Regions:
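C-terminal coupling/interaction segments
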Residues: 272-316
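A generic structural signal for secondary-structure junctions
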Residues: 85, 107, 111, 224-228, ...
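ABC-family P-loop ATPase nucleotide-binding domain
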Residues: 1-14, 311-316
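ABC transporter nucleotide-binding domains
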Residues: 4-6, 13-210, 214-215
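Residues at or immediately flanking beta-strands
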Residues: 65, 231, 293-295
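Solvent-exposed beta-strand sheet faces enriched in polar/charged residues
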Residues: 9, 235, 260, 295-297
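ABC transporter nucleotide-binding domain
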Residues: 176-271
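Short loop/turn segments at beta->alpha junctions
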Residues: 98, 218, 297-300
């Protein structure tokens, strides 16, 4: 059985501007499996949205090829409609409908849809269920757009800047919903220019700059590969790996370290003179699967982006 759900091979999209042509997406190649959360990270104009649109069959490629669930997404629209769902940054919704009516209509298009009430509850929209779309706030509208994308139970969920402009509390709730989709077995592919979002959600990240892929890998590996050395910070889930086990298995007595309890887990900062040795020890341990947000020398994906592109990426 083919384990690849999405396969892009030298995917290219060319536009013309002021009489000159340029590649908005330039020979991009990657593969994605059938489940998990993956991200395209880069600034505006990097080619993220155009790449997503070609994967979803909304825009044809000029060169190269893309296969999604074994078919050409631009040719086989029936497969894409049934098995892939996309939440664009902006969408034309019926302004006179309530949230409940809109999601009910959306659910009626698909035979195995989730109950609109369940989606409304998961997105924390119960208080707005009878509110007309025209009267929704920006944060509420963003969640409704995500609701229209997840209600059909898609095999592939494409999200374009899903938390752009949201306040931290609403953003964190939306991240929980996205995480849940990945854990249900959905392949989630999102675009973002938020370092925090990429580190928090994505198993693997593709960094794009000027239409090209300049780096890819897990946030952890990208940080380790592109930071020369320094003290190590990380967050660990105490429910999956206890602080006492961490102390006995990883944090040797001669190491200086600090522990801070955060909403996302235990934040550990370790002062070490041998970064490589400590990281190898940490990532070879049973704790590795519970570790998130590794920083080296107090830097993270922002440093990686500067290293591979030579430019700053402004985070939300």
């Amino acid at each position: 059985m083919n384990e690849v759900a999405v396969e892009a091979d030298r995917l290219t999209k060319t536009y013309s501007q002021d009489g000159e042509s340029f590649n908005a997406v330039d020979a991009v190649s990657f593969e994605l499996p059938f489940r998990g959360v993956f991200g395209l990270l880069g600034p505006n104009g990097a080619g993220k949205t155009t790449t997503l649109e070609m994967l979803a069959g909304l825009r044809p490629a000029d060169r190269g090829s893309v296969r999604v669930l074994g078919v050409d997404p631009f040719v086989d629209r029936q497969t894409m409609t049934r098995r892939l769902s996309i939440q664009p940054q902006k969408a034309a919704l019926f302004q006179h409908q309530t949230v409940q009516e809109l999601l009910g209509m959306w659910a009626s298009f698909f035979p195995h849809s989730r109950a609109p009430a369940d989606v409304i509850e998961e997105l924390d929209l119960s208080a707005s269920a009878r509110t007309r779309v025209a009267h929704l706030s920006g944060g509420q509208l963003q969640r409704v757009l995500v609701g229209t994308a997840i209600i059909s139970r898609p095999e592939i969920l494409v999200l374009d800047e899903p938390s752009a402009g949201l306040d931290p509390n609403i953003r964190d709730d939306l991240w929980r919903v996205i995480r849940n989709e990945g854990e249900r077995g959905t392949l989630v592919l999102l675009s973002t220019h938020s370092m925090e979002e990429a580190e928090e959600l994505c198993e693997s990240v593709i960094i794009m700059h000027e239409g090209r892929i300049v780096a890819d890998g897990t946030p952890r590996d990208l940080i380790i590969e592109n930071v020369p050395g320094g003290d190590v910070g990380f967050v660990i889930d105490p429910e999956r790996f206890s602080q006492s086990r961490l102390r006995s298995d990883i944090l040797e007595p001669e190491l200086d370290y600090s522990v801070e309890r955060l909403a996302s887990g235990l934040s550990i900062f370790v002062e070490t003179s041998d970064t490589d040795f400590f990281l190898k020890r940490l990532l070879a341990s049973e704790a590795a699967s519970s570790v998130r947000h590794i920083t080296v020398g107090r830097v993270g994906l922002d440093h990686v982006f500067r290293t591979v592109t030579g430019k700053e990426l402004l985070d939300d």
